[in-house]
């Protein structure tokens, strides 16, 4: 997101405690290695127009679920206070479409019911509520961005994730000529190429588009079997693609506002996989 937004000329101040992911060297990017939960804060940022709160802990041991939830809630509170201090005009809270998946549906949208299945989704739903209440009280425009199944082809577990995405596991297995596995061939998922997230977000910013809640997902939803066949170097066969279970849990999300968003050039999976393979061959 940092790399993508900076390419549009935005002046970016990025804060993180470790920066385990690659940030481009760019005159528009200033990296601040800080912890939002720390009592000591630098004064390197005087003010900003937009605050994007993307920080969240996703990993936890079974006995640390409560602390994960509390830490994420505290991160959100600190981010909101900082946004107020910096006189931000707009606050984006990055949430997840995982908040929908308690209920069995073919597809989910912004009007679907939400439920906290685990400490992570609980922290997201509480964070959404806190952000809404704080921003409304302090007259800060806000948007809750629920991000879906994003992929880029080069994910690393060290990027604070418990596991890589299903897409990345298939890509990794295919490179090693291993069997591609899924719970059900007909599981339907939304797939958003990671490069599209900053493009869509930039479009929202420069066009001053405002949504209280927005599923920031591409309009492309595919069944697992379609993606597996596209990734595979071989033709579909029982020896190559293995069905583990028969139960299907669809988690495809779409946005009811997709036609109102000015950004239209969402990357198809075929184009994305070609970009990934071209990059690998460099």
Regions found by a protein language model. Give the residues of each.
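N-terminal Rossmann/SDR dinucleotide-binding element
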Residues: 1-50
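NAD(P)H-binding glycine-rich loop region in Rossmannoid oxidoreductase-like domains
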Residues: 36-71
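NAD(P)-cofactor binding segment of oxidoreductase domains
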Residues: 50-51, 63-92, 130
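Short-chain dehydrogenase/reductase
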Residues: 69, 112, 117-128, 160-168, ...
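Conserved Rossmann-fold NAD(P)-dependent oxidoreductase catalytic core, especially the SDR/UDP-sugar
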Residues: 78-119
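Active-site Tyr-X1-5-Lys
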Residues: 102, 115-143
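NAD(P)-dependent short-chain dehydrogenase/reductase
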Residues: 132-188, 194
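C-terminal substrate-binding subdomain of Rossmann-fold SDR/epimerase-dehydratase oxidoreductases
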Residues: 175-282
């Amino acid at each position: 997101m940092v790399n993508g937004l900076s390419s549009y000329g935005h002046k970016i101040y990025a804060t993180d405690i470790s920066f385990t992911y690659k940030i481009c060297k760019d005159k528009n990017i200033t990296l601040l290695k800080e912890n939002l939960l720390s009592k000591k804060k630098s004064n390197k940022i005087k003010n900003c127009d937009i605050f994007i709160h993307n920080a969240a802990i996703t990993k936890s041991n079974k006995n640390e679920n409560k602390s994960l939830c509390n830490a994420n809630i505290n991160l959100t509170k600190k981010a909101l206070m900082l946004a107020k201090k910096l006189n931000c005009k707009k606050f984006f809270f990055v949430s997840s479409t995982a908040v929908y998946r308690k209920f069995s549906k073919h597809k989910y949208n912004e009007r679907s019911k939400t439920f906290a299945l685990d400490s992570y989704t609980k922290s997201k739903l509480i964070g959404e509520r806190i952000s809404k209440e704080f921003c409304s009280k302090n007259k800060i425009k806000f948007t809750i961005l629920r991000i879906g199944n994003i992929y880029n082809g080069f994910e690393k577990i060290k990027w604070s994730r418990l596991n890589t995405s299903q897409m990345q596991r298939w890509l990794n297995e295919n490179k090693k000529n291993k069997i591609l596995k899924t719970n059900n061939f007909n599981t339907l998922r939304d797939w958003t190429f990671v490069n599209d997230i900053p493009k869509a977000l930039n479009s929202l910013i420069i066009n001053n588009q405002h949504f209280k809640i927005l599923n920031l997902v591409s309009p492309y939803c595919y069944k697992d079997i379609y993606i597996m066949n596209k990734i595979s170097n071989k033709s579909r066969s029982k020896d190559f693609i293995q069905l583990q279970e028969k139960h299907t849990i669809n988690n495809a999300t779409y946005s009811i506002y997709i036609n109102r968003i000015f950004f239209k050039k969402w990357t198809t999976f075929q184009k994305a996989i070609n970009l990934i393979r071209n990059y690998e061959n460099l």
